[in-house]
Swiss-Prot record:
Gene source species: Clostridium perfringens (strain 13 / Type A)
Stated family: Belongs to the IspF family.
Name this polypeptide is given: 2-C-methyl-D-erythritol 2,4-cyclodiphosphate synthase
EC number: 4.6.1.12
Recorded name of the encoding gene: ispF
Keyword Repeat: no
Keyword Nucleotidyltransferase (UniProt): no
Subunit structure: Homotrimer.
Length: 156
């Protein structure tokens, strides 16, 4: 068994879509990044890659490579799932947290879980997503950005 941890953060800006867990969430701001800036999927990918000792998303999808400009993170997650399979790793479970003051995530979490399970070809009960605020503290609490953390367990 191998445990992996992932973390990602992006700044909220105007004129960008807010995409988390592959879900476009109605909001006046979106996350700034080279790809679609889906912090939830980025944290999940880093936890999976870390558990398998396969580097991180910066290694596999560098922001200096124009082919990842505006990339759909669900497609990147599918690639990570294939990479795990190729290296004989199976996902036992993933537990992830979105940290954002606004907007409310609860209505979107079921679809996020479905998207992640489908992309990784795992059962829905193997992926948990939850959300919390930081009670107005720090950059997430002030609405400057959104972060996400993920932990996973892999078996070989």
């Amino acid at each position: 068994m191998r445990i992996g941890m992932g973390y990602d953060v992006h700044k909220l800006v105007e004129n960008r879509d807010l995409i988390l867990g592959g879900v476009k969430i109605p909001y006046e701001k979106g996350l700034l990044g080279h790809s679609d800036a889906d912090v939830l999927l980025h944290a999940i990918m880093d936890s999976l890659l870390g558990a398998a000792a396969l580097g991180d998303i910066g290694k596999h999808f560098p922001d200096t490579d124009p082919k990842y400009k505006g990339a759909d993170s669900i497609k990147l997650l599918e690639f990570v799932g294939e990479l795990l399979n190729k290296n004989n790793y199976k996902i036992s479970n993933i537990d992830a947290t979105i940290i954002a003051q606004r907007p409310k995530m609860a209505p979107h979490i079921p679809t996020m879980r479905e998207n992640i399970a489908k992309a990784l070809n795992i059962d829905l009960d193997q992926i948990n997503v939850k959300a919390t605020t930081e009670e107005g503290l720090g950059f997430t609490g002030s609405g400057e950005g959104i972060s996400s953390q993920s932990i996973c367990l892999l078996v070989k």
